[in-house]
């Protein structure tokens, strides 16, 4: 007798209700997701561009295309798309948690700066939150 698979044992069937469902797109910002800004620029200045290639290749060739598909599907179904960004409002990042303030400052992830914006390939659309 065949054993049930692990996935079958721990999966439940469910139905998404578009009017009660939302897609959260979190931290897809230039500060950490753009190879020429923020972290990408910082790594290049430190001479570590090669070590960042894997990260940015995955973001550009896997993560962003899949998020684009999810966004299209959620919008088509009439669901909300909610954009969540993080960073600081204060230029010195004094309003950020102390453990992430240094990377926020180093990547210029400050509200109003281009690094704080969502990457161009995933700009929020009309009706998004």
Spans of model-derived segments:
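Active-site acidic carboxylates
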Residues: 1-126
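Glycine-rich oxoanion-binding loops at beta->alpha junctions
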Residues: 129
């Amino acid at each position: 007798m065949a054993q049930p698979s692990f996935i079958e044992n721990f999966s439940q069937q469910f139905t998404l209700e578009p009017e009660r469902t939302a897609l959260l797109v979190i931290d897809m910002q230039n500060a950490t997701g753009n190879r020429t800004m923020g972290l990408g620029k910082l790594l290049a200045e430190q001479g570590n561009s090669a070590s960042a290639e894997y990260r940015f290749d995955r973001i550009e060739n896997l993560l962003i295309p899949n998020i684009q598909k999810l966004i299209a599907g959620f919008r088509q179904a009439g669901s909300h798309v909610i954009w969540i960004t993080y960073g600081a409002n204060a230029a010195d990042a004094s309003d950020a948690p102390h453990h992430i303030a240094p990377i926020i400052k180093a990547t210029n992830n400050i509200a109003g700066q281009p690094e704080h914006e969502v990457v161009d390939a995933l700009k929020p659309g009309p009706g998004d939150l």
